[in-house]
């Protein structure tokens, strides 16, 4: 009698697959709605999951296809839970109409790291945006003089330190480099004489993060710097505060929660979509931010790839009502 090792699908097999699909769907539902329940040890996986949270949605069609291939109506029904959760979280982000209002001035943040263009080319692109305040991060130190020269005709005022630069059409005073506990300045604070009153502007680049097999999500130094920056912002007596820069993280990441408690993201109020900025060729996460206190964003947008590994963010602003 011939013997076959092939498994035949039957009620028992379908039931087993249904249970697996249902458990997977339940776990995905919990991760989407309650990512803060994921522990950050080992490897700070909780923060990593929060950083890429919208992308968990790609697992939903995978579960649905699995259920359909196994002929499991209950499995199909189980996938509805994470689908509804994802839609509740992110459909409003994707479909919300950005506000349209007159801007008193515009601000741009741009991590210019990368070797696909020149300081002069970037300067031309920056000037063409019409921005009044420009924060540039990761400026190669040998190129800083070229940036200053290329931007000088449009921006009469500037403050630079290490790889950070702040350029302005408005007068700057009280310039202060801030190391935030690191070996090099992670921020520059300056008071800009913006329309409607002074604004304390922070040009920021927090420490870089990596995902490594032996270490996990390496956000320790970034989180420490973010907490230090949040403390500085909380103690800033200026009525209007703006943080421009590369925070090397999503605001959904619990590591940036101290900043989110004191400042409001322009993207949430005046943007459309996720506003991903990195990597420039195919952005998958928003790590470049405009955070505000005492200012109202009238518009905000992620600009096209200008030759860096990040995309710039341009935001229109006016005094808060």
Feature roles, as predicted:
Residues 2-148, 321:
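N-terminal, active-site-proximal structural segment of metallo-dependent hydrolase catalytic domains
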Residues 113-127, 138-321:
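Soluble catalytic domains of enzymes that build or remodel membrane lipids, polysaccharides, and related
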């Amino acid at each position: 009698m011939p013997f076959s090792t092939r498994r035949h699908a039957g009620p028992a097999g379908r039931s087993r697959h249904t249970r697996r699909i249902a458990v997977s769907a339940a776990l995905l539902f919990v991760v989407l709605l309650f990512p803060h329940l994921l522990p950050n040890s080992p490897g700070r996986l909780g923060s990593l999951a929060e950083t890429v949270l919208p992308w968990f949605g790609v697992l939903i069609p995978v579960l649905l296809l699995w259920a359909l291939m196994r002929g499991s109506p209950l499995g199909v029904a189980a996938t509805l839970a994470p689908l509804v959760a994802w839609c509740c979280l992110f459909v409003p982000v994707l479909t919300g109409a950005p506000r349209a209002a007159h801007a008193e001035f515009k601000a741009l943040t741009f991590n210019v790291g990368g070797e696909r263009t020149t300081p002069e080319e970037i300067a031309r692109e920056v000037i063409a945006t019409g921005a009044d305040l420009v924060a540039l991060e990761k400026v190669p130190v040998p190129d800083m003089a070229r940036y200053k020269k290329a931007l000088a005709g449009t921006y009469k005022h500037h403050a630079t330190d290490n790889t950070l630069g702040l350029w302005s059409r408005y007068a700057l005073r009280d310039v202060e480099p801030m190391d935030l506990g690191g070996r090099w300045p992670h921020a520059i604070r300056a008071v800009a004489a913006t329309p409607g009153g002074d604004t304390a502007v922070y040009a920021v680049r927090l420490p870089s993060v990596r995902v490594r097999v032996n270490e996990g999500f390496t956000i320790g130094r970034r989180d420490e710097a973010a907490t230090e920056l949040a403390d500085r912002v909380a103690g800033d007596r200026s009525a209007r505060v703006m943080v421009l820069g590369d925070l090397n993280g999503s605001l959904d990441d619990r590591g940036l929660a101290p900043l989110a408690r004191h400042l409001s993201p322009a993207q949430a109020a005046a943007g459309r979509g996720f506003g991903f900025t990195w990597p420039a060729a195919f952005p998958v996460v928003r790590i470049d931010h405009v955070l505000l206190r005492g200012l109202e964003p009238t518009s905000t947008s992620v600009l096209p790839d200008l030759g860096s590994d990040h995309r710039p963010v341009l935001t229109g602003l006016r005094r808060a009502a």
